[in-house]
Amino acid sequence: MSKKPAALIILDGFGLRGETVGNAVAQAKKPNFDRYWNEFPHQTLTASGEAVGLPQGQMGNSEVGHLNIGAGRIVYQSLTRVNVAIRDGEFEKNETFLEAMTYAKENDKALHLFGLLSDGGVHSHIQHLFALLKLAKKEGLTKVYIHGFLDGRDVGQKTAKVYLKQLEEQIKEIGVGEVATLSGRYYSMDRDKRWDRVEKAYRAMAYGEGPSYQNIYDVVDDSYENGIYDEFVIPSVITRENGEPVAKVNDGDSVIFYNFRPDRAIQISNTFTNEDFRSFDRGEAHPKNLHFVCFTHFSETVDGYVAFKPVNLDNTVGEVLAQNGLKQLRIAETEKYPHVTFFMSGGREEEFPGEDRILINSPDVATYDLKPEMSAYEVKDALVADINADKHDAIILNFANPDMVGHSGMLEPTIKAIEAVDECLGAVVDAILAKGGHAIITADHGNADVLITEEGKPHTAHTTNPVPVIVTKKGATLREGGILADLSPTLLDLLGVEKPKEMTGTSLIQK
């Protein structure tokens, strides 16, 4: 039986902007894209910042883009999720935080705050520490100690004193908190099982062992004098005038670890929480029975409470298609294959019933500017054959070229990449239209639209520019103000499938 497939075609890294200088998207000859743009209803979508669950003004990326597209809802990344919770007042109602604080207060125990001391926003954000200090004050805690991990990697390599100053001012203003230890993230945030490093951080925090200082700034100055910058500062103990450590982590204390990214938080957390820990000798007096809180789910091996539990991504587009008995195809070359499968399915590896996948190998070249067409022609050939064989009701396709070649920051190869993709796009969309089907032509974020910086240097990063959306349905009208989360509801709409309640995005096709 002849199928009338609906396809979601993602031109990866294909952003739109008016200025043509350094803009491969604007400079490329793309007769097929232009033809569909002129012939069919079209709009632009926001693919960056809070519209995709990132902080305001932050550029999108392929993982985040495909996650939002497949989920049909804004998927808040951890940083934004915590920021929004602080902004909306949900943070101070968080039961996991309140339980840790109540426990400390009722049992006359200390609260220790562990985490990376910067505003890098990759592993942590210093504003989250300040929010915890405010909450601790509100809850009437007095014994609150900070074990700060110095960054120098996601921020400038000699910026520790900037953050220590901010912390000092906040402690003064809020009226609670003392710095107990400082260590470079090289030690406290190792993820490569270099346990000798972790042990140094642990012994400073649990036993008060290591270089000692009365003044937090002396830790940094001393290190700088020895050519040791923030990331590598040796775990150091802050002491009172009598030489005693300000605080050690003791039996039964509360801990809140405010890093939200798990990978570099797991080892030090295991050291404090794991009964069966054997990676080094923690000593007889190691702190036991801690009320340990992780900001997000770090790992099954970490014995702790989780403040921001994983978000459930049920009823992504693939699951909805499967529930409705529709056959679906995911197709891309190697570079973007995980995006149309794993990320599009909300972080699920396995196929849904009725889901087929075609992986086309990306070319074996050092960098893709050497072969701008990549494997687009092979992707196109495989897909056109599939369309003509009437196998699938829904198709999700990614052309990697504008993004992967765009990362070279080289204009000419990126123009060639887009011209190759345009040729393939024409063959695919025309095959779909010939079957009476529909295509949604769009992108996940910008990149190829800016290849030269204002200083005239190569620009290799993503952009915050809007992305196109074309729906090949004559007579339809697309609404303005759309976001990536609206694409799956639009695909379901074309297939006559009702979107599930979990999808808060809405079809772009105006009724």
Curated annotation (Swiss-Prot):
Mn(2+) 1 binds at residues 403, 407, 462. Keywords: Glycolysis, Isomerase, Manganese, Metal-binding, Phosphoprotein, Sporulation. The active site is at 62 (phosphoserine intermediate). GO terms for cellular component: cytosol. Pathway: Carbohydrate degradation; glycolysis; pyruvate from D-glyceraldehyde 3-phosphate: step 3/5. Mn(2+) 2 binds at residues 12, 62, 444-445. GO terms for biological process: glucose catabolic process; glycolytic process; sporulation resulting in formation of a cellular spore. It is an enzyme of class 5 (isomerase). Its EC number is 5.4.2.12. Substrate binds at residues 123, 153-154, 185, 191, 261-264, 336. Its cofactor is Mn(2+). The keyword Glycoprotein does not apply. GO terms for molecular function: manganese ion binding; phosphoglycerate mutase activity. Binds 2 manganese ions per subunit. InterPro entries: Alkaline_phosphatase_core_sf, BPG-indep_PGM_N, Metalloenzyme, PGAM_B_sf, Pgm_bpd_ind. The modification Phosphotyrosine is found at residue 36. It catalyses: (2R)-2-phosphoglycerate = (2R)-3-phosphoglycerate. SUPFAM superfamilies: 2,3-Bisphosphoglycerate-independent phosphoglycerate mutase, substrate-binding domain, Alkaline phosphatase-like. Belongs to the BPG-independent phosphoglycerate mutase family. HAMAP family: GpmI. Essential for rapid growth and for sporulation. Catalyzes the interconversion of 2-phosphoglycerate and 3-phosphoglycerate. Monomer. This is 2,3-bisphosphoglycerate-independent phosphoglycerate mutase. The gene is gpmI.
